[in-house]
From Swiss-Prot:
Name assigned to this protein: Multidrug resistance protein MdtG
Localization, UniProt: Cell inner membrane
UniProt keyword terms in alphabetical order: Cell inner membrane, Cell membrane, Membrane, Transmembrane, Transmembrane helix, Transport
Any GO molecular function: transmembrane transporter activity
Phylogenetic placement of the source organism: Bacteria, Pseudomonadati, Pseudomonadota, Gammaproteobacteria, Enterobacterales
């Protein structure tokens, strides 16, 4: 379709990867509204057993993703990022299809683990775009790309619930597999990458990857920052609906109110992420990162004292606007400190820390709420984010944020990457 030596239009690749991240985010979240119902349909009975199995099938995907991500990242640095996008999209499509055919809970659990092993579309999309964009536009591009997964994750539960009510639980898995296969086709036909495969013996080992970074200590601290961001985000998820019900009292549309309050941070992040990413390109992503963490602390504390669902919704909207800058700012700093040759592994390591946060965050939130009540979760989360802000600030001060090379700053907005 394209000449192999033709220049790569990174903006077109950004558009297609955004669509791919949107479809992947939607596909993952399509099944979330009825996951416990599907577990129940596979023969799990009893309140405690249903809770346990629902938690297992949810968390095992992130756990196995954390294990597999470094392997896929290394393979991406050897074979190219496009082939990893194709592998991920097609693999997840096949697994989703098989999930719709599962006959018992053990089969479903194994398939959820396999989904984590074969995933990784979004981190590989980040790595692909990070190696093709002009460095001085990293914040804007990665911020824009992040909105793809966020918007898909917002739309997915709504569409998934409607589809499950209309067609039943199993057909939704087949529809999800179709969405992922569409993602595979779009990637195959329209994503372009010029990549020279690297022999395995020439690949850097993990220690050499870390040593080759411009600022290894800063990058390691950014991995920890990513983990804490996800812990803070996930800690609120298990108790949000119950907290909203306590605030709302006896109202008929509690599910609608809870859904609205759950989704408003994502809507705010869609608006803020590209804009704050672009601002970070001008003033430095490290400033955006610290400011967003501090603002998050100031918004989390009053959430513990709200009296109505709408007060909580307003604060969560503002929190989403701040949170929309966090991961893109981290990713931009990673781009500044890693060469293209190791970008796949750096982003995959970051994804592993993110997955660990996705697993541990809900556990922490559920534990705190069980012992100290719903309101305490927001105060504990605020303390976690405050620690993150202080830790990140000290790490940036000790290591210094790496400035953009002058030649990157001078590139024109319409640059094509060869």
């Amino acid at each position: 379709m394209y000449s192999s030596d033709a220049p790569i239009n990174w903006k077109r690749n950004l558009t297609i990867t955004w669509i791919g991240c949107f479809l992947t985010g939607a596909a993952f979240s399509l099944v979330m509204p009825f996951l416990p119902l599907y577990v129940e349909s596979l023969g799990v009975t009893g309140h405690s057993a249903l809770n346990m199995w629902s938690g297992l099938v949810f968390s095992i995907t992130f756990l196995f993703s954390a294990i597999a991500s470094p392997f896929w990242g290394g393979l991406a640095d050897r074979k190219g990022r496009k082939i990893m996008l194709l592998r991920s999209a097609l693999g997840m499509a096949i697994v989703m299809l098989l999930m719709g055919l599962a006959q018992n809970i053990w089969q479903f659990l194994i398939l959820r683990a396999l989904l984590g092993l074969l995933g990784g579309f979004i981190p590989n999309a980040n790595a692909l775009i990070a190696t093709q964009i002009p460095r001085h536009k990293s914040g804007w591009a990665l911020g824009t790309l992040s909105t793809g997964g966020v918007s898909g994750a917002l739309l997915g539960p709504l569409v998934g619930g409607v589809l499950a009510d209309s067609y039943g639980l199993r057909p939704v898995f087949f529809m999800t597999a179709s969405v992922l296969f569409l993602c595979f086709l779009l990637t195959l036909l329209f994503i372009r990458e010029q990549f020279q495969p690297v022999a395995k013996k020439e690949m850097l080992h993990a220690r050499e990857v870390i040593a080759s970074l411009k600022s290894p200590k800063l990058v390691l601290s950014l991995f920890v920052t990513t983990l804490i961001i996800q812990v803070a985000t996930g800690s609120i998820a298990p108790i949000l609906t119950l907290y909203v019900r306590d605030l709302a009292g006896n109202v008929a549309n509690i599910a609608f109110i809870s859904g609205m309050i759950a989704s408003v941070p994502g809507v705010a992040a869609l608006i803020s992420a590209p804009r704050l990413g672009k601002l970070g390109d001008r003033i430095g992503p490290e400033k955006i990162l610290i400011a967003a963490l501090v603002i998050s602390v100031l918004l989390l504390i009053p959430m513990s004292f709200v009296q109505t669902p709408w007060q909580l919704g307003l604060l969560r909207f503002l929190l989403g606007a701040a949170d929309g800058a966090l991961l893109p700012a981290v990713q931009t700093l990673l781009v500044y400190n890693a060469t293209n040759q190791i970008a796949g592994r750096v982003f995959s390591y970051n994804q592993s820390f993110r997955d660990i946060g996705n697993v541990t965050g809900p556990l922490i939130g559920a534990s705190v709420s069980a012992n100290y009540g719903f309101r305490a979760v927001f105060l504990v989360t605020a303390m976690v984010v405050l620690f993150n802000a202080v830790y990140t600030g000290l790490s940036l001060r000790r290591t210094g944020a790496t400035a953009l090379p002058a030649q990157d700053v001078e590139k024109d907005d319409t640059s094509l990457v060869r």
